[in-house]
């Protein structure tokens, strides 16, 4: 059976919530994709934002590798971040405040590598600072997309990064 993976992410929330009605906003955050879509119906999607480099899940995985945590990186970075200080390491928030409808996480990943290489920061603090910077970027992009997409019935979050509790808390 041929199934479009991205369409599966866009429509599977309707299996969990039969009351979910079109149109709704979809924040898709995974290892391969980082997009905000207006889901208008089956087969009807309007992309409001997308990544221009690394997807968010990919950035989590690469951060885990930089910190020597292994794969899959998302849950490992999240666990390490719980014992860190998100304000301890100054990391960039790429495109924060920009009117461009894009995500960019490659520069954030590079900043994580520089922070590690400096030897001045604990891994826990780097993980927490990375996670917070990533969340700040997602929230900023999401707010901008929601302001321009028109009325929607709900915000749906899908993809592997949607399991991140800090991300879920920030989105609530």
Q: Can you annotate each of these PLM segments?
A:
Residues 3-25:
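Conserved phosphate-binding catalytic cores of ATP/NTP-utilizing and phosphoryl-transfer enzymes
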Residues 78-156, 161-172:
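A contiguous, well-structured pocket-lining segment that forms one wall/lid of small-molecule binding clefts
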Residues 1-5, 47, 73, 157:
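General beta-strand structural signal in soluble alpha/beta enzymes
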Residues 15-21, 40-46, 69, 169-172:
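A glycine- and small-aliphatic-rich helix-loop capping segment at beta-alpha/alpha-beta transitions
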Residues 28-29, 35-121:
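A short helix-loop
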Residues 1, 13, 143-146:
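N-terminal small/polar loop signature for handling phosphorylated ligands or for N-terminal nucleophile
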Residues 9, 35, 162-164:
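Short, active-site-adjacent cap segments at secondary-structure transitions
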Residues 3-4, 25-30, 37-38, 158:
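Short beta-strand segments
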């Amino acid at each position: 059976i041929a199934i479009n993976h991205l369409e599966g992410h866009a429509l599977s929330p309707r299996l969990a919530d039969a009351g979910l009605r079109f149109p709704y906003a979809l924040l898709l955050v995974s290892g391969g994709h980082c997009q905000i879509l207006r889901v208008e119906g089956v087969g009807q999607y309007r992309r409001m934002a997308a990544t221009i480099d690394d997807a968010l899940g990919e950035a989590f995985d690469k951060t885990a590798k930089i910190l020597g945590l292994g794969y899959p990186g998302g849950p490992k970075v999240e666990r390490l971040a719980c014992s860190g200080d998100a304000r301890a390491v100054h990391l960039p928030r790429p495109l924060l405040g920009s009117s461009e409808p894009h995500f960019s996480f490659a520069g954030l990943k590079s900043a994580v590598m520089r922070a590690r290489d400096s030897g001045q920061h604990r891994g826990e603090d780097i993980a927490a600072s990375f996670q917070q910077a990533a969340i700040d970027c997602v929230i900023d992009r999401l707010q901008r997309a929601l302001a321009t997409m028109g009325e929607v019935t709900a915000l749906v979050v899908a993809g592997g990064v949607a399991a991140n509790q800090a991300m879920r808390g920030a989105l609530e």
